[in-house]
Amino acid sequence: MAKAFASQGDMTEKKITFDEIGRDLWAFTAEGDPNSGVIIGDDSVMIIEAQATPRLANKVIERVRKVTDKPISHVVLTHYHAVRVLGASAYGADQIIMGEAARGMVMERGQEDWDSEFQRFP
C-alpha cells in the first residue's frame, strides 16, 4: 500500500482571513494552507494560486463576491503544487496562466494529486 501524502493527514478546519493589503489587492489565507492573491482590475478579477480543490476555491470566490461582482477572468498559477493548482476549474476563468514546467507536472501528476487532495478536502 502506498504511503499517504503528508498533507493528507491534516483534516482540521483552518482559520480563514481575507484582508485588503493594498488598493484592490486582497490576500486569502488559511493558517497552514496555501494562500491565494486577488487583484481587482478595472473590468475583471485575477486570482493568484487556485487552492487544492474546487470546494476550497469556492471559499475564495465567496470572499471575492463580498467585495466585487466583476468576473474572474484570469487565474495565475506560479508553480506546481497540488494544493495551489487543482482548484483552478472552479473559477470559470477565460485564461489560466502557468509555465510549461508547471503544466507538465499537472499532466504527469494531476490525477494522483487530485485523488490525494480530494480525500483531504472532499
Where are the regions that the model predicts?
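Short acidic, Pro/Gly- and aromatic-enriched capping/linker segments at domain boundaries
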Residues: 6-20
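Conserved beta-strand hairpin/beta-sheet module of binuclear metal-dependent hydrolase folds
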Residues: 18-63
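Phenylalanine-focused residue identity feature
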Residues: 5, 18, 28, 118-121
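Active-site HxH/HxHxD metal-binding segment of metal-dependent hydrolases
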Residues: 62-122
